[in-house]
Amino acid sequence: MKRASRQKTAPSLFRALRDGAAGLCILCFALFFLKNSGIWAKFRPNAGETASENGGLTLFCEDVGQGQALLLTCGDRAALVDTGLAGKAEGLLDALSDQGVTRLDYLFITHPHSDHCGGAKTVLSALPTDLLVVPDYYDKDALYIQAGEWLGAADTALDIAYAGREYALGSAKLTVLSPPQGNDIDDMNDLSLVLLAEYTGVKMLLCGDASQTIEESILPLGHIDLLVAGHHGSRTATGEALLDDITPAYAFISCGRDNEYGHPHREVLDRLEKAGAQVLRTDESGVLTARVIQGKLRVTAERDQ
């Protein structure tokens, strides 16, 4: 009887192990499929993601209403491009904290309009920052006075940027494409720092509020994986010449819901559609995130449109 019992137990145990292994394989395959098909992202909204989750280059297009604030991270390095309006600064700091940022290597202010620089003083007061980067401007006195107001008592150095300057962000590189050194530009939008971020062959173009005239002056660039559309989707930017040259796979637009300017303008959306770009907007989808993982760009949004 004992032998018979053992003979029945062994096959039963084998079947249990076999069935369990098969179930585990199916589960692993299902998880692998979800993660690599892009469906996984729908179950992991980016609102709770942190910069440290991915050592590669990541861009967060923050939801600051009718303004712009872009966080770039690579490894443990962080750069903030603009801050949005002063009234959005505390919310921006909360978002940066949620994304794991406790200090900044750089704060880039693309140009001195309140929807881009309004929160600069608050950010510099709250976060240790190595370098404040502002665009070269012919009125140096005004430039230094404005920068001094932002800096206050912050222990942060000031750097004046112009085309050709490069800034290391971990293994990523940020290159200034505009404005030129010693320029006499008097249109504040066209004074915008235009930045090219590069990492493992992936390129992101950040245009500030620069107009089509400036866009055309920095061409040719070749293919760009992600474009942060200029001037919140205004018809004055994101021109056909730029789009024909860079053929972006994705375009982010930072704008406020039901804003008084009507951003993004229909003409810009039509141009982007014609160029084949997938468009995501902060007014519709909240925080937008672009991560470079194994040489490929993965884009997610805080909420569905």
Give names to the regions the model predicted.
Residues 1-305:
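Non-globular, low-confidence helical/coil segments that flank catalytic cores
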